[in-house]
Amino acid sequence: MTVRLFLAKGREKSLLRRHPWVFSGAVQRVEGKALSGETIDIHDAQGKWLARGAYSPESQIRARVWTFLPDEEINIEFFIRRLQQAQNWRDWVAKRDGLDGYRLIAGESDGMPGITIDRFQNFLVLQLLSAGAEYQRAALITALQHCYPECAIYDRSDVAVRKKEGLPLAQGQVVGDLPPALLPITEHGMKLLVDIQQGHKTGFYLDQRDSRLAARNYSAGRRVLNCFSYTGAFAVSALMGGCTQVISVDTSQAALDIAKQNVELNQLDLSKAEFVRDDVFQLLRAYRTQGEKFDLIIMDPPKFVENKNQLAGACRGYKDINMLALQLLNPGGILLSFSCSGLMPTDLFQKILADAAVDAGRDVQFIEQYRQAADHPVIATYPEGLYLKGFACRVM
């Protein structure tokens, strides 16, 4: 018999608006015993059926909705349908942007909560981030093999958020060949190397594709500083755009080594590229002291906000680092500044940049706004899916 979760009175409004999460505080009672991740039916306080989802007893998100259709079962066929729906959109994006690497499944926004799947050529890279996703692992992999028989599957569920779901970290080969140490993919005419096994996230930041193209369009004749460069995709884009010099800064020598390989792979002028292993905050202060100036600065830091308690400190960090960047720009220079923190609202991030400009003593115009690329959609009922935000700021 299916386990039933009943919401407290008045707590059904978010589900009626088709938001896919049920928080622990909204739960009145659970009838029956469910394993972690098992499929349950969700009802309002009067017993009306609302949704079918995955139960997660150890998480603040007590249930994640698989479907709002009462007759839809959660099985292999369900995952095949979801994959096919997602692929229809990715086919269009891949053709438009010349891609062989893209996000295939973006969790809740593709109706598959807690599941991230990136495709790099014929390798599918999984991240199963919730108890429900882990519980459905076998069904999902069977569905992937049905839809993508040509693809190997690799698991990168080595993500700390799994601990909040009571899950161990997981990584390794699932189906087919191991990915090579570095796998080349293509976007907007660039070739970029992906480290699936050891790289950040699933190996590469696919979400910044549109921003990399924007950087290319701003680069002609400019001296560029690429902060938190990782494997240098922004640097390659800047060189393709005709920059006079690009300096890439990261704390990881391994990432900088791949960045250099990316420049060489695209047969670009290596003499225009410099790779600096350093702390970005310290280097920006040193550059300010030395009187260094740039015409384009790319500021793409890692996530500063992991929970709401860190938001105030993150605001200070974002303001300080962007203030330093703005002080290094020539008049007419451009700062492309990003936040990948889902807990950082777009309007607050824009205010932080405005405050940074005041503290830097620079008059700044906002000229463009960015978000994650189109293969990272945001379903209308789940605004939390919009996590990446960015602005192009022009110094007057």
UniProtKB/Swiss-Prot annotation:
GO terms for cellular component: cytoplasm. SUPFAM superfamilies: PUA domain-like, S-adenosyl-L-methionine-dependent methyltransferases. Keywords: Cytoplasm, Methyltransferase, RNA-binding, rRNA processing, S-adenosyl-L-methionine, Transferase. It catalyses: cytidine(1962) in 23S rRNA + S-adenosyl-L-methionine = 5-methylcytidine(1962) in 23S rRNA + S-adenosyl-L-homocysteine + H(+). Its EC number is 2.1.1.191. GO terms for molecular function: RNA binding; rRNA (cytosine) methyltransferase activity. It holds the Pfam family Methyltrans_SAM. It is found in: Cytoplasm. It is an enzyme of class 2 (transferase). Residues 2-81 form the PUA domain. The keyword Transferase applies. Belongs to the methyltransferase superfamily. RlmI family. HAMAP family: 23SrRNA_methyltr_I. Specifically methylates the cytosine at position 1962 (m5C1962) of 23S rRNA. This is Ribosomal RNA large subunit methyltransferase I. It comes from Serratia proteamaculans (strain 568). The gene is rlmI.
